[in-house]
Amino acid sequence: MICYPKVYDVLIESLRPDLNLPVDEWSDRFMIIPKSSGSSEYGQYKTSRTPHAREVMKCLSDDHPCKRVICMVSSQQFKTQVALNWFGSTVHQSPSNFLWLMPTGALAKRLSARVDKTIKAVDVLRERVAKPNSRDAKNTQEVKEYIGGTLFMPTAGSAANLAEVPARRVAIDEVDRCESNVDNEGDPIKLAEARQTTFSHNKKSYYYSFIQ
């Protein structure tokens, strides 16, 4: 049975022009850091609190020519929040598939929980991402569907998790901890970037780690 109001809403949403705000400006306008995240600075996100993150987000914006952004900063800095901001901007402004790799299953589970909290806190994301109990779309620990795309959050330790997933945007957390050769099939970074071959003109990659 087709739910006509829902189909109509999706059609109208697809016809709206992209906002096309740079990631940092989108974040200042829409991103909310949930209290449940444990952050001491929860509430409305403000780039001014971490001004050194602004240039990174500018580079991740669609209209910036940079294709690959690499960051190495101290622990508990802006790395993952910037990736969350980029993901949120993707869902709201220019939806497409987003591949977000973690080095271990434990970190992937933690990231998925953080993504869920962010989606719940941000109105423009909550109304676009599938609900966990949705019958029409998927929202699991590793896969979260939204209007116009899907977020994939596998670990980097299995080549099978990287195969046959086209993705315009790729983020790799703690890239230095990823295995250098996944199931004897190659570097996980190269395997992930192979998923971007159909998006050569507008792909983006964000690799981040912390200083030891």
Give the label of every model feature segment.
Residues 1-212:
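Short, flexible loop motifs at catalytic/binding sites
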